[in-house]
Every structure is written in structure tokens, then in C-alpha cells.
């Protein structure tokens, strides 16, 4: 399984442009999934110096990613080279700003 994980507010508390405190539940979940053989992608809007800060913070808590803001080799082989800024192809997206469409449907049906 390919899992794309956001940084700010997801792996670490929201503190942009700095790095917030680690969110250990999510970090440990990602570590377990990697140990199980899953592919992890760090998927963040951070760039340049701020991206390096995020990568360093992840390494300091023992979290290594297979890809950083990039598609897997299998995705590139199957779909070709993606343009910069394209959505990363993953089976699961973990992001503090995300909403599950099923939950949204339930809310719409219940609350109009």
C-alpha cells in the first residue's frame, strides 16, 4: 500500500514556518506501516529550506520516507512523468485538512 502523509498539522503540530511538536500517534502508525512493507510518501507544500527542516525533523523521530513530494517508480512507469504540482498517487492520504467523502455524504443527508 502507498501512503501519502502531510507534514504540518499531521505528523507535527501546526507551527509553520517552524516545526511543531511531534504527533506521536501518527508518527508511530507510519513507522508500523513502513515495517509492514508499505511505501511512505511525505506529501507537503513545504519547499527548499522549510522542506529540509521537515525532512530533518522526520529523521530525528526515526521516520524515513520512500519518496518526498514525488510519485513512486511504479506510478511513473504506469502513468508516465507527471507535471510538477500534480496530485501524488497513493492508496491512502493522511492529512489534517482532509475529510472522508462518506462522512461528508452522511452529514449532507442528516443536516441538509
What are the language-model segments listed below?
Residues 1-112:
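HAD-like aspartate-dependent phosphatase fold
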Amino acid at each position: 500500500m502507498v501512503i501519502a502523509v502531510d507534514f504540518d498539522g499531521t505528523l507535527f503540530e501546526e507551527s509553520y514556518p517552524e516545526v511543531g511538536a511531534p504527533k506521536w500517534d501518527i508518527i508511530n502508525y507510519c513507522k508500523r506501516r513502513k515495517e509492514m512493507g508499505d511505501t511512505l510518501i511525505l506529501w507537503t507544500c513545504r519547499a527548499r529550506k522549510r522542506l529540509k527542516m521537515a525532512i530533518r525533523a522526520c529523521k530525528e523521530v526515526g521516520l524515513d520516507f520512500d519518496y518526498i513530494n514525488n510519485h513512486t517508480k511504479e506510478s511513473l512507469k504506469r502513468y508516465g512523468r507527471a507535471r510538477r504540482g500534480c496530485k501524488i498517487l497513493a492508496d491512502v492520504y493522511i492529512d489534517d485538512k482532509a475529510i472522508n467523502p462518506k462522512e461528508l455524504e452522511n452529514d449532507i443527508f442528516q443536516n441538509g
